[in-house]
């Protein structure tokens, strides 16, 4: 049985800019560079096809891409890896009112293969809150297929 898990958060009171949440995560041991030094993201003009790309992109260029996509009502998509571990998530968002973290990259699990939401709570939610990111609401969801 396969599992799909997501966390949905609202960071609107922290900032209305997605890039601000991304940069905060990058200061909290989360990297938008994968182990090969590439950024995995949804490119400009994707039209919700979710055709993820892997490229070497500077932080400045990534900021420009994210800002452009948000300003043009395009969905931002970015892979995050937790430094020093095999744990991560994909972030998708059109605004900071609803940021979806797909726990699909080396998903942390319990012995029965359900998602270890406590790991994500400690390493994402608590870190964000402790560093000034007010989270108005959050949900944890897990589905089986």
What do these predicted ranges mean?
Residues 1-4, 99-145:
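Acidic, proline/glycine-rich low-complexity IDRs
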Residues 10-14, 83-85, 96, 106-108:
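Generic structural motif
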Residues 21-29, 69, 121-128, 132:
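Hydrophobic, Leu/Ile/Phe/Ala-enriched alpha-helical segments that form helix-helix packing faces
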């Amino acid at each position: 049985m396969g599992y799909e898990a997501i966390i949905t958060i609202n960071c609107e009171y922290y900032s209305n800019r997605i890039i601000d949440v991304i940069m905060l995560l990058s200061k909290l041991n989360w990297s938008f560079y994968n182990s090969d030094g590439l950024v995995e993201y949804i490119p400009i003009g994707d039209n919700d096809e979710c055709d993820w790309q892997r490229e070497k992109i500077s932080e400045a260029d990534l900021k420009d891409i994210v800002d452009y996509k948000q300003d043009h009502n395009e969905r931002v998509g970015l892979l995050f890896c937790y430094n020093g571990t095999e744990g991560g998530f994909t972030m998708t968002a059109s605004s900071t009112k609803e940021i979806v973290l797909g726990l699909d990259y080396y998903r942390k699990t319990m012995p029965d293969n359900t998602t270890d939401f406590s790991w994500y709570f400690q390493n994402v939610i608590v870190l964000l809150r402790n560093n000034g990111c007010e989270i108005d609401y959050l949900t944890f969801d897990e589905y089986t297929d």
